Amino acid sequence: INKKSDEEIEEMLKGNDVFIYAAGVDERVEFPHPVMDYYDKFNNAPLRRIFPLCKKVGVKRAVVLGSYFAYLTKSRPDMGLQQRNPYFKARMMQEDICKNAVDDNFSTCVLELPYIFGTQPGRKPVWTILIEQLKMMDNLPFTLYPKGGTAMLTCRQVGQAIAGAAVREKAGFEAIPVAMYNMKWDKFLKIVYEARGMGPNRKIVGVQPWMMKLGMIGIAKDYKKRGIESGMDPFNLPDIMNLDLFINNQYTKELGVQEDDIEAAITDSIRVSQASYDGKVKLLEMKGE
């Protein structure tokens, strides 16, 4: 979209009621300092440009795919997450852009999405990063991991949430935390290990944040050596992963999202991620443009 002129985008928008923004990058894509410039370029600047074009041609509503880290930031102001994590700050700025775009004839809705499982044909799942982390502990009789948990949903459910938000007749701005399932990390990892062919009985040992922070020292040094500014503070991540970052699914059900097989979706994601990690398949990675 960044390669198209305003006039070309207007032609694409004409005759439509809703604009859906499902583009951009998340915290797992690496950028040099200052990382905020890249989050603005890929996640936020397109909205500042396209919203006025939407209004010009009569589009009435926009649905933007955001992050549940914005939901966490608002839920836990005591943690100072915006100050420590550029990605969180960028997602909050994205919601402000959406909020400020609202008028009597234009509404906006941000779907604050958690971890998503399932596969898209030809696209590399983000979970190859998890495979890399776990491989380092494969020779141990147990896996060390934080004690918290996360909200989640499947690819199919994301599509249903988008469709529900698109036809939702609600004026103004709203940010909806979206999830259908909540799962502790230890239960999640047992599904992961079974998907990797290592059986369902892998021992998972929960660790305190301070222990994980020790492991982050090397990662922080690696970032510095390579000139990378992480979107998430490596020394704040253990505190975040120690939380039960759960979401009540009542909001998601209001969008018309139906039940799905989350364990099968996790299994599919991990199997494709493992195949990608092993070099058995070539897939398209996440990128800004």
Predicted regions and their residues:
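NAD(P)H-binding glycine-rich loop region in Rossmannoid oxidoreductase-like domains
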Residues: 1-45, 49, 71
